[in-house]
UniProtKB/Swiss-Prot annotation:
InterPro entries, sorted: SARAF
Region (Disordered): 308-334
Domain notes: The cytoplasmic C-terminal region mediates interaction with STIM1, while the N-terminal lumenal region mediates regulation of SOCE activity.
Signal peptide extent: 1-31
Keyword set includes Membrane: yes
Record's subunit section: Interacts with STIM1; the interaction is inhibited by the interaction of STIM1 with EFHB.
Entry protein name: Store-operated calcium entry-associated regulatory factor
Subcellular location: Endoplasmic reticulum membrane
Membrane-topology descriptor: Single-pass type I membrane protein
Short name of one Pfam family: SARAF
GO cellular component terms, A-Z: endoplasmic reticulum membrane; endoplasmic reticulum-plasma membrane contact site
Transmembrane segments: 169-189
Protein source organism: Rattus norvegicus
Segments on the Cytoplasmic face: 190-334
Length: 334
């Protein structure tokens, strides 16, 4: 009886030690598991947004979507939402396929999913919600062709915007041209005397013809003085026979002629220099454009890059079109 009583406490102690050992081993797995510590290979999908940040524990949070370069540049287009699917394990890390809607001129280049390791950058466990996408944005073939086309029309578009811009001197230039045109009109095209009187067999002498009448020379031999008007010894023009058809004669040009000639020359210079700096090669009202504009001016081709409402371009279709594009890449732990 004494031996049995002594053996029972030992068995109880052994049982308690085994139970304690089991709790120490299985406790963290059963009761103390951290829900934010997950195995990266168990993540099946990621939905990332351009206006959100990742969670963080050891490091600072990063944007869920981050452009890091590419042929198109990061300012060309920004996707709103990207979804990445776990495509499997390649022996090194998880591989991803990321899809989003992009403009038809752009596509994903190199992509990589970056996740924060839970304890270190080498930890196979990651912090839940710490993954983000880093991507390159490249041009498609259509985007490259649009880029080349926009380069052809660059000079024309720049000139139009300079003329229509409030900050440019286009309005001042136009105002100066109008003033010069008015001066030339007054000097050359405006006739203060009105239209000549109708034809008459015996027209009266006008003021201009009287000025020239006193200076007419002697008629040649064989001509009557009735057809030549009064004679004078000074050199000048006749107002008799000629005035019957012309109605009036004009005085010689004075200083107004030379000032008008100078203004006209200045106006022609300004028009010439303005046309030389633009792609216009024809007349002002009917410009002739380079061969690249032919067939494209009234076409509905895709508008050049950077085009917008009110911009003068070779395309009338400014509607943006999108398509679903995919990018493929691996994982980087940070």
């Amino acid at each position: 009886m004494a031996v049995a009583a002594v053996g029972r406490p030992r068995a109880v102690r052994c049982l308690l030690l085994l139970l304690l050992s089991f709790l120490l081993v299985a406790g963290p797995a059963l009761c103390w598991k951290n829900p934010d510590r997950i195995l990266l290979r168990d993540v099946e999908a990621l939905t990332l947004y351009s206006d959100r940040y990742t969670t963080s524990r050891r490091l600072d949070p990063i944007p869920q979507l981050k452009c890091v370069g590419g042929t198109a540049g990061c300012d060309a287009y920004t996707p709103k939402v990207v979804q990445c699917q776990n495509k499997g394990w390649d022996g090194y890390d998880v591989q991803w396929e990321c899809k989003t809607d992009l403009d038809i001129a752009y596509k994903f280049g190199k992509t990589v999913v970056s996740c924060e390791g839970y304890d270190s950058s080498e930890d196979q466990y990651i912090l839940r919600g710490s993954c983000g996408l880093e991507y390159n944005l490249d041009y498609t073939e259509l985007g490259l062709s649009k880029l080349k086309e926009s380069g052809k029309h660059q000079s024309f578009s720049d000139y139009y915007h300079k003329l229509s811009s409030v900050d440019s001197c286009g309005l001042v230039t136009v105002a100066v041209l109008f003033v010069l045109a008015f001066v030339v009109y007054k000097l050359f095209l405006s006739d203060g005397q009105g239209s000549p009187p109708p034809y008459s067999e015996h027209p009266p002498y006008s003021q201009h013809s009287q000025r020239f009448a006193g200076t007419a020379g002697a008629p040649p031999p064989g001509f009557k003085s009735d057809f030549t008007g009064p004679q004078s010894t000074s050199y000048g023009a006749s107002s008799g026979f000629g005035s019957a058809f012309g109605g009036q004669s004009y005085a010689s040009s004075g200083p107004g002629f030379w000032s008008g000639l100078g203004a006209g020359g200045l106006l022609g210079y300004l028009f010439g220099s303005n046309r030389a700096a633009t792609p216009f090669s024809g007349s002002w009202y009917h410009p002739s454009y380079p061969s690249s504009y032919a067939g494209a001016w009234n076409s509905h081709a895709y508008s050049p890059l950077g085009g917008g409402a009110g911009r003068y371009s070779a395309s009338s279709n400014t509607e943006s079109r999108t398509r679903t594009t995919s990018g493929y890449g691996g994982t980087r732990r940070r």
